[in-house]
Regions:
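Cys-dependent protein tyrosine phosphatase-like superfamily
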Residues: 1-123, 128, 136-178
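Ser/Thr-glycine-rich phosphate-binding loops at phosphate-binding pockets of nucleotides
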Residues: 133
Length: 178
């Protein structure tokens, strides 16, 4: 496929008997990706889909420069207009979370887990919705008490190809040793 204009896809991962973690690519994404696919997303349509899915919060895992490069610099204001809370916790593409992510994450993890416990929905996204998105989805499962190997398997079952790199997988497995 060379033109990415189809409906915005959110893969859903159940947690806490009713909470849902959503995994997706970057809403409103435009331009060519590394594989030569042309993305022509509508920010308004994608955010409407996120709203209709029932997201209480969205966590962007791309850097600010990536967000702008992807044509999604207006995401925070589009979400705010729909009363959806936006968090920005960037991770470098292909990498595991670093100390900057950990500092930001420590301020929001409890809020996200509380939303999930309240049977609410939290959407995670990076550029393609695979590496960083899958890593953080698995991290939320681990924080909810799921052992790392099972968390990885559950995330990969709902969104194949997630947690793309060995460094991301090692990061998750090390969380259980910490």
């Amino acid at each position: 496929m060379s033109d990415r204009t189809e409906a915005f896809q959110i893969d859903s991962l159940n947690v806490y008997n009713g909470g849902v973690i959503g995994l997706a690519h970057c809403p409103g994404r435009c331009g060519l990706d590394a594989q030569g696919h042309l993305w022509r997303r509508s920010m308004d349509k994608d955010v409407a889909t996120i709203h209709n899915w029932g997201a209480a919060a969205v966590v962007s895992l791309v850097t600010l420069s990536e967000l702008n490069h992807l044509g999604a610099g207006s995401l925070s204001s589009a979400l705010s207009a729909r009363n959806i809370v936006w968090y920005h916790c960037p991770i470098n593409d292909g990498q595991a979370p670093d100390f900057r992510f950990e500092a930001m994450w420590s301020k929001i993890e409890t809020k996200l887990l509380r939303l999930l416990c309240e049977q609410r929905r939290v959407l995670l996204h990076c550029a393609a919705g695979l590496g960083r998105t899958g890593t953080v989805a698995a991290r939320l499962l681990i924080a909810s008490g799921v052992p790392a190997p099972q968390a990885l398997a559950r995330v990969r079952a709902v969104r194949p190809g997630t947690v793309e790199t060995a460094v991301q997988e090692r990061y998750l497995l090390a969380l259980c040793d910490a």
